[in-house]
């Protein structure tokens, strides 16, 4: 069976690479999308969620933030601000981040950046959801 090369890149560089991907399932802004070897060239906007990576002897979940994907016949590139395999998510740290974001949203303070706090809460909740998938 032909397989796909997957590369997930953040501003800090490549954070996940795999050469033997049979299928990657992503949440795009247009809905869920599955990418396999031979997929037509595609560019799509990715929303905060997870990527499910299927390979010969199992699968893995990666928490990702908003970003973009580029699919080619034999390669899938995912460009996001943050990405973290479920196996590496520090659940306690994610719970603290969630609590901090909720506190910022509850503050009645002109200095609170509401949009930033909402994004932080969304990221923390996503990390907690993905950690449970592992």
From Swiss-Prot:
Complexes and interactors: F-type ATPases have 2 components, CF(1) - the catalytic core - and CF(0) - the membrane proton channel. CF(1) has five subunits: alpha(3), beta(3), gamma(1), delta(1), epsilon(1). CF(0) has three main subunits: a, b and c.
Keyword Glycoprotein belongs to the record: no
SUPFAM superfamilies attached to this UniProt entry: Epsilon subunit of F1F0-ATP synthase C-terminal domain, Epsilon subunit of F1F0-ATP synthase N-terminal domain
The gene coding this protein: atpC
This protein's UniProt keywords: ATP synthesis, Cell membrane, CF(1), Hydrogen ion transport, Ion transport, Membrane, Transport
Physiological role: Produces ATP from ADP in the presence of a proton gradient across the membrane.
Pfam families: ATP-synt_DE, ATP-synt_DE_N
Localization (cell): Cell membrane
Region (Disordered): 94-115
PANTHER family linked to this entry: ATP SYNTHASE DELTA/EPSILON CHAIN, ATP SYNTHASE EPSILON CHAIN, CHLOROPLASTIC
The family this protein is said to belong to: Belongs to the ATPase epsilon chain family.
GO molecular function, one term: ATP binding
Protein name, as recorded: ATP synthase epsilon chain
Cellular component annotations (GO), alphabetically ordered: plasma membrane; proton-transporting ATP synthase complex
Main location: membrane
UniProt cross-references to InterPro entries, sorted A to Z: ATP_F1_dsu/esu_C_sf (IPR036794), ATP_synth_F1_dsu/esu (IPR001469), ATP_synth_F1_dsu/esu_N (IPR020546), ATP_synth_F1_esu_C (IPR020547), ATPsynth_dsu/esu_N (IPR036771)
Claim: Ribosomal protein is one of the keywords in the record: no
Organism: Staphylococcus epidermidis (strain ATCC 35984 / DSM 28319 / BCRC 17069 / CCUG 31568 / BM 3577 / RP62A)
Residue ranges crossing the lipid bilayer per the database entry: none
Topology of this chain in the membrane: Peripheral membrane protein
Protein origin, superkingdom: Bacteria
Compositionally skewed regions (Basic and acidic residues) per UniProt: 94-104
């Amino acid at each position: 069976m032909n397989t796909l090369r997957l590369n997930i890149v953040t501003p800090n560089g490549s954070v996940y690479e795999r050469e033997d991907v049979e299928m990657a399932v992503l949440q795009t802004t247009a809905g869920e999308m599955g990418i396999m070897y031979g997929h037509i060239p595609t560019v799509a906007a990715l929303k905060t969620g997870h990527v499910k990576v299927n390979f010969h002897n199992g699968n893995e979940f990666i928490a990702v933030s908003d970003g973009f994907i580029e699919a080619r016949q034999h390669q899938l590139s995912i460009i996001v601000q943050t990405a973290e395999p479920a196996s590496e998510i520090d659940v306690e740290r994610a719970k603290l981040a969630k609590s901090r974001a909720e506190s910022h949203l509850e503050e009645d303070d002109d200095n609170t950046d509401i949009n930033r706090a909402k994004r932080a809460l969304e990221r923390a909740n996503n990390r907690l959801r993905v950690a449970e998938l592992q």
